[in-house]
Amino acid sequence: MKMNNQKNANIMIKATVLSAIILIFLCFIVIFYVAFSGDNTSEIQENGERYGTSDFYRYKDKIYVLVYGDGLLEVEGVDIPTFKVFDTEDNNGNVAYDKNRVYFGNIAVSDLDTNKLYYVGNNYYSDGTNSYFCSTSVETYEELSARSINIKNIFHFLFKTKRPQHYFYPYKKLETNKRLEKVEELKNSATDGEEVYYAGEKLVNADIYTIKTIEDALFYFADKENVYYKSKLLSFKNNGKLK
């Protein structure tokens, strides 16, 4: 009798463990489905109207933009009849505008006069007074983990909250009201005739006539005196051997 009870107990334990494994597996399937079922990127790309070669699409009287990592996100508040993208040879398909605002991805900026708006080059945009840099590479709002992304997506799916956005195109307003021109020798750089800017940040004490990229040193620049890493002025000076 005792052996039968022990045998039955072992069977119950095995059945419980097996049930738990099956339940966990089903939970993973549900989480995976919930996490990815809300993305309608493929549907919009296949059935929507793309604006040239840009990242913007029109679909069912709404405008969407491709934000890498998040898929296609709605651009809210767009005046569709006046909505335009920039027709340039640069890879700046993540920026557009209408009669009211400029859109860096799906983020609107309202202090640029779109009647005077022009593309400077090197990912800079200006109306002659206000100027912005907008990167073509996305950044995250926070340190992301698969767990945090799934939790946010599950809340969106279950409670119909606004679709969570984890990535954005970083942009920066320049501290100048002068007209900009791009710096040919430096990627992501522009000048107002006095100052040099990299990714929207001022290169302190940079000489606009001698600054250049250091060969085989990504993101490092030097003028006749100073050396920079991106927009940071480094503590050592140019010894004249940097090329």
Could you describe each region identified by the protein language model?
Residues 4-25:
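N-terminal Sec-pathway targeting helices
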Residues 10, 35-243:
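Non-catalytic tandem-repeat scaffold regions and their flanking low-complexity/translocation tails
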